[in-house]
Each structure stands twice: as structure tokens, then as C-alpha cells.
Amino acid sequence: MGNQRPIAVDLFAGVGGMTLGFEQAGFDVLASVEIDPIHCATHEYNFPMWAAICASVTNISGNDIRKRSKIGDREVDVVFGGPPCQGFSLMGKRAFDDPRNQLVSHFMRLVTELNAKYFVMENVKGLTLGEHRHFVDEVIENFEKNGYKILKPYQVLNASHFGVPQHRERLFLIGCRQDLTLPHYPSPITKPAKAKRIPKELVDLPDSPTVRDVIADLPDVSQYPELIKRDWCVADFPEPKSNYSEYLRGLRSDSADLSYPRDCDRSLLTSSIRTVHSQTCMERFSKTANGELEKISHFLKLDPDGICNTLRAGTPSNRGAFTAPRPIHPFMPRCITVREAARLHSYPDWFRFHSTKWHRFRQIGNSVPPLLARAVALKIMQILEVQVSKPEEVIQLNEDG
């Protein structure tokens, strides 16, 4: 699997948005730890060459991770992940020590047990606001006590500044061992298309891809009745409308993408099961202007010349299994499909999701857009001073639907 590629470990891996971003930057993510068996199975499908460890971080050690993957006794270059934020308790002065916040402490424990050179911890922007900042300060303080220095000031990164057609802000904490040099945060490469206010430091940057760029070349799902009962079919694809969609379809190479090529059937339209809306609902969707909220559902109708709002996950089954609002397609009277959401999140078309619609949208909404993860990973690759080339090995994906 190319030992010259730096080694990474993904904690709280989900379906693997960060795994893919780090792979694209040139890392071999030899182990990914995820407690949810549904996410784990999806991760295993998309990354069959590496170990997907279905376990809780609370019950696993760094040595376990080494033994259950191909890491063995090799040095781990980076550990990354996003401890779930739903359980954060911020009451009291020592929130870090609250048992309800144990997932962050276990993330830190595994970073130190693996003696990782670098770590990246991502989380919601809300942790940087108000009283929540004290919790972030405690996290930093505890990492420093455990022999790691932190890149300061910490930053919130917006996916739309890194070539993703979606407004999505996430906190990234980056650190390294005391004997190493800290990297820098990545600098924006795009500004959000059709944004009402552009910070002056972004004015001269090219626009991010637009909603139109992203989904206009996907087949019209209403023309495929088989998509009412299953999530894939053989389809006729129009010509790509942008470099972005051409890249996600696997028809255009990207010199910055050092991921393993995937061998899959490109005639398949996947993750595209149809939502059956009532006639009344479709009429409301049709009457809603692009870029406006539909008055009853409060769903946003996407502006084809702008970017997508933040795609959210909804709540897990132990918290009510509520579905997050899905945007309305800019040209058709329906909500967007999972594949369209995946495109808006920068997932390539070979990437598959769970067959149940609720799980699939949750998988996307919970994940870091791969292009955003790649931007962060490239800065760590840069500081490691490792030269990595595009692998020749092709990964076969199972195409049984």
C-alpha cells in the first residue's frame, strides 16, 4: 500500500470524509475507528484497502489500533477526527473533566498512546463562541500538558473557501509533538459564489463552484422509475457542466489529488432513490423563488448561481431520529437526492452511502467535506517534507448495487 506514504489514523471516522481528504493529500489512513456499524460498513466499502475498526474510542487502546491494522510498530504521522459535539457539557469551570465530555479526552489519550507526530481535531464553530471558548481553552491546556503544542490562534475554516460549493464552517485544532514544527492553516483558494458580503481578503479569489456547476450534469431521476424502490440504476449522463463535476465523475484528473484510483462502473447513477412528494408539495416548491425559503416546510430552494447552505445531519436514533431539512432542487419540484448532496459536499461519484435515505443524509451531514479535509492535510504533508506521487494501484469497488 506504499510505505513511503505517511501514515494516518481517523477517530470518529463516520463514513470517511476526512479519511478521503487525507488520502487525497497523500496519506495512507491505515486505521479508522467508528462505533456505528452502519457507518463502519460504508467506510469499509469505500476504503477496502484499510482497516475499519468498529469500536468505541472509550474501549480501544493505541496498541489495539496498531494490532488491528497494518500500522504495526511504524510511526504514526497524524491522528485526526471530530469527537461528537452533542454531548458537550459546559457547566462549571472544568468542563473538560466532565464525564459527558469524555470523548474529547479519549481522542487526546489515543493521540498520545499512538505517539502521533501531528493531530487534527475538528468540531462545530459553536465551540468558539461565548462560554464555549473556555472548553476549547481547556482542551488546548490538556494537550500541552501531554506534550503537544497547538497552532494558535485556532481557526474556523469555511468549506466554501476551499473549492466546496457549500457554506460550512468548522473549528480545526492542529497540534504536534514538542520536538516537531507546527504547520500553518491553509489559505483560502476560492470565495463563495454570489455571496452578499465578501471579506476584503477574499475579493480577488476565484468563485467557488456553483450549485449549477455541481448538479446540472446529473441525470433527471424522474425519468428512472426504478429509483422509486432502489438507490441506483444505469443512466444516461449529460456532458459535465464544469471542471468540478468532471472531476467528481472521474473524467478529469487533479494534480493535487493523490488518492488511489477506484475502479467502478461509471454508467451507474448511485445514491439517488427518489422522494415521492405530494402534488400540493410540488406546487409549493415550484412557486418558491431560488434562494428563498419555502413557507410551509422552511426548506431552502437552492440558487443555481450560488452555493448550498450547510447540509445538516439531523439527530441519531437515540435522540429522536429527526430528519434535517433538505434543500429544494433549483430546477425541479423536489428535494435534492443523496448524490446531489454528496456532490455539494465534494464527494466523488464512486463514493457510496447507506441504502436507507435517512442514514445517507445523516452520513453526509455529519462528515467533513473531503476538499476541506484535503486542504488541512496538505499543510501537514508540506511540513512533513514527504514527496508522494499518485498511486498506480487501482482499488476495485464492489458494484452489486
Task: Please describe what each predicted stretch is.
Residues 234-401:
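C-terminal target-recognition/interaction regions appended to catalytic cores
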Residues 2-115, 125-129, 133-137, 144:
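Core alpha/beta nucleotide-donor-binding catalytic domains of modification enzymes
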